[in-house]
Amino acid sequence: MSMECVVQGIIETQHVEALEILLQGLCGVQRERLRVHELCLRSGPNLGVVSSEVRLLCDLDQPEPTWTVKHVGGAMRGAGADQISVLVRNMIESKVSKNALRMFYALGYKLDHELLKVGFAFHFQRTAHISVSVSSVNKMPKVHAIDEAVPVTPGMQIVDVTAPATSENYSEVAAAVSSFCEFLAPLVHLSKPSISTGVVPTAAAAAASLMSDGGGTTL
């Protein structure tokens, strides 16, 4: 079973440019544009008593949109999990064809909700393969109405940091993610997705400093 380590936070849109400068300096790679249509599907009663949820992700930034299916399992629990500052959970992910949505509907899944995430991402190697995405999360007034999407939280953007892991190395991966997040702390507080921490009081001052000196150093 594949696993992933995850932390999440929020940042005011006015400070996103400063965060991008910081990430560019830390990661040492070019940013990638992010435009993903996410469909959350839930299983119907014909597929068992326990409801199952899968996410279909359509990457709209490709010349030909590509599709991925992702199933997020339960989070790791127990004393060990409580001592780790990141969420460690089971996860299965696979590339699929554009017919995947039709297939899930045929299996009895129903569309629960859909989102459009627009922003940018950095992918780099630092002990683990870490991905950082900064995006505006938008909802649609009508099914699949991407062009009419409106922000869920105007003026705020979501920051996600994820890294794939296994049952053998999740401790090292979690430590790498935690260490990386410390560099972002002046601008955004990152924690387990279930824990809401709000914006960072020092963000405005940190952003002003970054904008004036043009970024940091590569790790």
Swiss-Prot record:
Keyword S-adenosyl-L-methionine tagged: no
Subcellular location: Nucleus
Primary localisation category: nucleus
GO biological process: abscisic acid-activated signaling pathway; carpel development; defense response; DNA-templated transcription termination; ethylene-activated signaling pathway; miRNA processing; negative regulation of DNA-templated transcription; petal development
Highest taxon of the lineage: Eukaryota
Metal-binding is among the record's keywords: no
InterPro entries associated with the record: Mediator_Med18 (IPR019095)
Complex and partners: Component of the Mediator complex. Interacts with YY1 to suppress disease susceptibility via the repression of genes glutaredoxins GRX480, GRXS13 and thioredoxin TRX-h5. Binds to ABI4 to regulate abscisic acid responses; recruited by ABI4 to ABI5 promoter in the presence of abscisic acid (ABA). Interacts with SUF4 to regulate flowering time; recruited by SUF4 to FLC promoter.
Function: Component of the Mediator complex, a coactivator involved in the regulated transcription of nearly all RNA polymerase II-dependent genes. Mediator functions as a bridge to convey information from gene-specific regulatory proteins to the basal RNA polymerase II transcription machinery. The Mediator complex, having a compact conformation in its free form, is recruited to promoters by direct interactions with regulatory proteins and serves for the assembly of a functional pre-initiation complex with RNA polymerase II and the general transcription factors.
Protein known as: Mediator of RNA polymerase II transcription subunit 18
